[in-house]
Every structure is written in structure tokens, then in C-alpha cells.
Amino acid sequence: MSPDLADPNLRATSGSGIRNVALLVAGCFFMELLDGTIVVTAIPRISSSLEISAGAAGLVVTAYLVTVAVLIPLSAWLTLRYGYRRVLLSAIAIFTLASLGCAASQSFGELVAMRVLQAVGGAMMVPVGRMIVFERADKTQVMRLMSFIVWPALIAPVIAPLVGGVITTYADWRWLFLINLPLGVVGLACAWRLIHGRPAETPPRLDRLGVILSCGGLAALTWGAHLIADSHPGWPLAAALGLVSVVLLVAGARHMLRVSAPLVDLRTLRIPTFANAMVGSSLTWLVIGAIPFLLPLLFQTVFGWSPIKSGALVLFVFLGNIAIKPGTSFLYRTYGFRRVLLAATICLSLTAIGCALLTASTPVVAIALL
């Protein structure tokens, strides 16, 4: 039996104890997702306040999401190295303090730097929390507890556009980040009380080269895209950064295929069904993730709508998501995965085409239904 499983603090628990841990993780997930999406409706105001183009201001969102994606693989290693308690408390503290830093930023560079720091905390909060729930819960509890954690993924994006629109309209955009402070303090207090234990085992050697190559490649790609989105794009530098990103990412992939303990085990992509699922889902999520980011920019910068009206209409994207969730299991059982996925992909493509054809004269009801 490993040291952790012998520790009474990490043995499977029943009743309110494990539920409270799951609710804590759900709260962290809610805070992370809310922060990732609430900023979208404020992009035009942020760009005006910091005197940059709306497209360039999108880096505030992109830098956060890319950093989270890059650092999530590190969370497991950090947990084994430093323990659940230390990592989760540090993650919540970093996220909360970085939120304060975002609110205090006086320049675009400062804001992006604080968003990256925010993402460092966000990348560790939820994965570590899920690991705690899996380790402490009985097998009979796992599905029910994971449902607690999944719901914030549905609720936060639903309310974020409208909440962001209201805050941006009636207060300064900096309040978008200040609302994280009380949430973070409560999360820290709960984590301090609920989370205990130490690393279950000695972690494998960290794949430092994999971290450097993947982080460098994605950073170059993100910065190059930012330059293209600027009102005065620097095409030569953007092209150079694009080339650098390709070289670094290809080198990183080759490296991770050769080492025994890579940052991300790309050898799993040799399984055809898994590889096809990853390619298909990645392309699908590119579209799904772009729509709620691009629509507020379209509504506010092109149509001239208010942040509240813009956020309220984007809200329908996520309401549709919630509305279909209860029926997904029935659809899969009745028609099978293949038919449902093909139909969903076709509907998503038609929706994206419809969004591209929107004009200021399009009826609001039609936009909401779309």
C-alpha cells in the first residue's frame, strides 16, 4: 500500500467529507471557466482603455487559454513532487493574486503578463482537484461526484457573457478580475481545511526539454497570431515567429516520441481510433471556441451593440448546449456515436456559415435561434 493510501486523510471517504471536496473542486472549476470567458464581452472596452485594436486585445483571452493548455500536463508531476495540499493551495493563491494584478494593470503588456500568471494557477487547480476526488472516493461514488464537477463547465460559460456585459456597462472592466478575490479567499479557506496528504510516489524525471520546446513553440505561435491581428500587422516578424513555432513544435513532438517519460505521451496517437477522435474533436472545438469569442467582437465593434445586448445573445450559444445535454445519452443509444457525431458536425458547420452571414439588420430572434 502506498504512503498516501495508508494516510487516513486520503482514504476513500463517505458522506459530506468527499462531497465537500468535490464541491471545492467544482468551485475552482467554475472560477477558472468564468474567468476564461467573462473577459470576452469586455474586449472592445479593454482595447479602447489600453489603446490597442480589438483583435490584438484578444491576446488577453488567448494567452490565458494557451498557458492553461501547456501547463496542465505539468500538474500531475507537480502533485507527485510537492503533494496535493501544497499544489492546490499554491494554485488558488496564484490565481487569486494574479486576478488582483490583472485589475491593477496599467498597460497591455502588464495585463497579458498577469493573465499568463493567472493561467499558471488555473492550470493546476482543476486537474489536481480531480486527482484528489479520484483517489479519495469509492468507485461507487466517482460518477456522481464527477457530475458535481462537470456542471460548472456548463453553467460558467452560460452566465459569463451576460455578467461580463453588465459589469463592463455599469462599472470598469477591471471589476471582471476583482470578483475573483472573494471566490479565491473562500476557496483557499476551504482547501486549507479539507485537503491533506503527501505525494503518493516519487515522480519520474521532469521532461524539461519537452516543456521548453512545447512552451516556446506555442508562445511563438500565439505572439505571431497577435501581430497579425494588430491594426498595423508586422508581417515579417509574424512570419518568422510562425516558422520558429513550427520548428520548435516539430522538434518537441520528435523528442517526446523518443523519451521514456515525455511531457505528453504522443505514442497514444498511434491508436487509430484515438488519433481520429483527437483530430476531429480538435477541429470541432476550434469552431466551438471561436464562436463565443468572435460574436461579441462582431456585435460590439461592427454592429455597435452594447456589451449587455452582446453578452445576452452569446448566452444563447451556451443555453443550447445545456438544453441538449440531457438528451445526449438517449441520442447515442438510439442512433449510435457515428450518426450523432456526423449530424452534430454538419449542424455546427451550418451554424458557423450562418454566423458569417449575420448583419446588423438580422432579426435578434434569428440570431438567438442560430
Roles of regions detected by a PLM:
Residues 169-280, 287:
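Hydrophobic transmembrane-helix bundles of small-molecule transporters
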Residues 18-43, 50-69, 74-76, 83-88, ...:
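12-transmembrane solute porter fold
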Residues 46-47, 78-79, 163-171, 225, ...:
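Interfacial helix-cap and linker-helix signal at transmembrane-aqueous boundaries
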Residues 94-104, 183-190, 217, 225, ...:
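Transmembrane-helix signature of multi-pass solute transporters
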Residues 1-17:
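Intrinsic disorder in cytosolic terminal tails and internal cytosolic loops
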Residues 105-106, 138, 194-197, 229-230, ...:
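Short helix-capping/hinge motifs at transmembrane helix termini and TM-loop junctions
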Residues 72-209:
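Helix-loop-helix hairpins in multi-pass membrane proteins, especially solute transporters
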